[in-house]
Amino acid sequence: MASGQESRKELDRKAREGETVVPGGTGGKSVEAQEHLAEGRSRGGQTRREQLGQQGYSEMGKKGGLSTTDESGGERAAREGVTIDESKFTK
């Protein structure tokens, strides 16, 4: 059991140095904080999927995937002729 505690301490040290040690925990300053951030982000995505339905969630992902630092996903979709059905964004 001591090795588990040592491993967690090592992860905590890395987290304090700014390294992400838990997937989805970016920005947390400890292992525990990163775990909470990751859990909240996951739950937020699940809630959004429930609100929009699977098709709306997929369409929104398509639009978001087209966004860049220079232009929004909607602008790029219009420029490139990609069809995004925004009527699916509401359930």
From Swiss-Prot:
PROSITE patterns: SMALL_HYDR_PLANT_SEED (PS00431). GO terms for biological process: response to abscisic acid. It comes from the Eukaryota. Induction: By abscisic acid (ABA) and osmotic stress. It comes from Zea mays (Maize). LEA proteins are late embryonic proteins abundant in higher plant seed embryos. They may play an essential role in seed survival and in controlling water exchanges during seed desiccation and imbibition. Residues 1-91 are annotated as: Disordered. Keywords: Stress response. Belongs to the small hydrophilic plant seed protein family. Residues 1-19, 32-51 have a biased composition (Basic and acidic residues). Pfam families: LEA_5. InterPro entries: LEA_5 (IPR038956), Sm_Hydphi_plant_seed_CS (IPR022377), Small_hydrophilic_seed_prot (IPR000389). This is Late embryogenesis abundant protein EMB564.
